């Protein structure tokens, strides 16, 4: 059997660990070969590929961030129009099963390819942790660790200068990074997309903390956080070429509004892409490896149109169509637990 693998969408710590596990499992357990398509689905459209080998180069991938295959986003319309070329590329390279590793967009494309009778097994990745039907995605733990360490450091400088610090983190429309980093770092408030915020409530908590004699205030702000209707208006960035919302720096805009209302120095730190880069944590390496092994097993078992998942401690599989039906967002109960520590 000949397996194809690609990484699509944004990069993420742990991608190389999945590739390594797929290659090792296919070679050692099944005697199959693996072809990597470069720069995601673009590699399928342009027939750009590389033979992957079970050797020292493959072993060294485990701790390496990013993706050795490269990654890119391809517009869904271009992908649909390119279906004949995709089928030709798979046929020319003798690919029996394709294993796409990616987030919402990549897995949606994989689900569509499955409907077009392409044998596909999906592997979920995203630092945002917003893929449904799996408890967690690899990459999230690394991003969470980076964010938490950064906020830990900001506590000391904010305390020294009696400042309000707004820390903007990634996550798009899901608040998992912000929520978990806020809890782990002892932040005094967390704003997430699932819970529109009231600027007056933010300022009330800030004032209350300083009135009690506390020396600083840390607020974690998810990049997709939005004000409640009828409160303040923030600048909107419109949509990009893929129909995704452009985020316009909510923390910086919020800082201006907070400074208007309280007599305190407000500073903003945007963590940005540092959350996506670098060496994956041990947890992400293990999870990514388990996902890769299970995806290779599913490919050889003929379980196509599936996505590998983590449920509890067990790796399983669910239909791709179920996994991409909706995003996994922060439930009210989880936010309520975090809110007990606000102020």
Curated annotation (Swiss-Prot):
The active site is at residue 128. InterPro entries: ATP_PFK (IPR022953), ATP_PFK_prok-type (IPR012003), Phosphofructokinase_CS (IPR015912), Phosphofructokinase_dom (IPR000023), Phosphofructokinase_III (IPR012829), PKF_sf (IPR035966). Mg(2+) binds at residue 104. Its EC number is 2.7.1.11, 2.7.1.144. ATP binds at residues 10, 73-74, 103-106. Substrate binds at residues 126-128, 163, 170-172, 223, 267, 273-276. Its cofactor is Mg(2+). Pathway: Carbohydrate degradation; glycolysis; D-glyceraldehyde 3-phosphate and glycerone phosphate from D-glucose: step 3/4. Coiled coil: none annotated. Magnesium may play a role in formation and maintaining of proper enzyme conformation and multimerization. One of its GO terms (cellular component) is plasma membrane. One of its GO terms (biological process) is canonical glycolysis. Keywords: Allosteric enzyme, ATP-binding, Cytoplasm, Glycolysis, Kinase, Magnesium, Metal-binding, Nucleotide-binding, Transferase. GO terms for molecular function: 6-phosphofructokinase activity; ATP binding; diphosphate-fructose-6-phosphate 1-phosphotransferase activity; fructose-6-phosphate binding; metal ion binding; tagatose-6-phosphate kinase activity. The record marks 105 as: Important for substrate specificity. Pfam families: PFK. Inhibited by high concentrations of the substrates fructose 6-phosphate and ATP, and by the reaction products, fructose 1,6-bisphosphate and ADP. Allosterically inhibited by phosphoenolpyruvate (PEP), guanosine diphosphate (GDP) and citrate. Catalyzes the phosphorylation of D-fructose 6-phosphate to fructose 1,6-bisphosphate by ATP, the first committing step of glycolysis. Can also catalyze the phosphorylation of tagatose-6-phosphate. Both sugar phosphates can function equivalently as substrates. Cannot catalyze the reverse gluconeogenic reaction. Activity of PfkA is tenfold higher than that of PfkB. Activity with tagatose-6-phosphate suggests that PfkA and/or PfkB may substitute for tagatose-6-phosphate kinase and further support glycolysis. Homodimer or homotetramer. This is ATP-dependent 6-phosphofructokinase. It comes from Mycobacterium tuberculosis (strain ATCC 25618 / H37Rv). The lineage of its organism: Bacteria, Bacillati, Actinomycetota, Actinomycetes, Mycobacteriales. The gene is pfkA.
